Swiss-Prot record:
Belongs to the RuvC family. Mg(2+) 1 binds at D8, D139. GO terms for molecular function: crossover junction DNA endonuclease activity; DNA binding; magnesium ion binding. Mg(2+) 2 binds at E67. GO terms for cellular component: cytoplasm; Holliday junction resolvase complex. It comes from Edwardsiella ictaluri (strain 93-146). This is Crossover junction endodeoxyribonuclease RuvC. HAMAP family: RuvC. The RuvA-RuvB-RuvC complex processes Holliday junction (HJ) DNA during genetic recombination and DNA repair. Endonuclease that resolves HJ intermediates. Cleaves cruciform DNA by making single-stranded nicks across the HJ at symmetrical positions within the homologous arms, yielding a 5'-phosphate and a 3'-hydroxyl group; requires a central core of homology in the junction. The consensus cleavage sequence is 5'-(A/T)TT(C/G)-3'. Cleavage occurs on the 3'-side of the TT dinucleotide at the point of strand exchange. The gene is ruvC. Its EC number is 3.1.21.10. It is found in: Cytoplasm.
Length: 173
């Protein structure tokens, strides 16, 4: 059994999602958003760091998974996103959590089955996979999708390393 904290980083809104993995079962623990309403970037980064640190204290996760930076059309936005990621990662590393990073396309492919999925599709699948009563907020759903992706990737890595990977008719079982 392990508790995974997933993060969807942003300099204005950082989503977080916490799930518990027990074998192949996933259980929703909590999710939400860290909102930074101030204008100056250094203060926003401080708030991201403090918010992620508080979430780590509250939920005591075993590992930390975060979305990688994608190349945005706006270079300034990509740089700010990278800095917000850095603030979140430092919060995890300061608590000795292992950090795992996943590309947005990999996350969408894992959760929806389509690497080019829309946000609404991710929300719907997160709701379905975690048996939630309603769709979570978009940024929280993205963070939960990061955590779900980590569960699937780590589960498959465990199956491969333990020799429990069975191939039949070209499909994984």
């Amino acid at each position: 059994m392990s508790i995974i904290l997933g993060i969807d980083p942003g300099s204005r809104i950082t989503g977080y999602g916490v799930i518990r993995q027990q074998g192949r079962q996933l259980e929703y623990i909590g999710s939400g958003c860290i909102r930074t309403a101030v204008d100056d970037l250094p203060t926003r980064l401080k708030l991201v760091y403090a918010g992620v640190s508080e979430i780590i204290t509250q939920f005591n996760p075993d590992c930390f998974a975060i979305e990688q930076v994608f190349m945005a059309k706006n270079a300034d936005s990509a740089l700010k996103l990278g800095q917000a990621r850095g603030a979140a990662i430092v919060a995890a590393v300061n608590r000795d959590l292992p950090v795992f990073e996943y590309a947005a396309r990999q996350i969408k492919q894992t959760v929806v089955g389509n690497g080019g999925a829309e946000k609404a599709q991710v929300q719907h699948m997160v709701r379905s996979l975690l048996k939630l009563p309603a769709n979570p907020q978009a940024d929280a759903a993205d963070a939960l999708a990061v955590a779900i992706t980590h569960c699937h990737v780590s589960q498959n890595a465990l199956r491969i390393s333990s020799g429990r990977l069975n191939l039949a008719r070209g499909r994984l079982r």
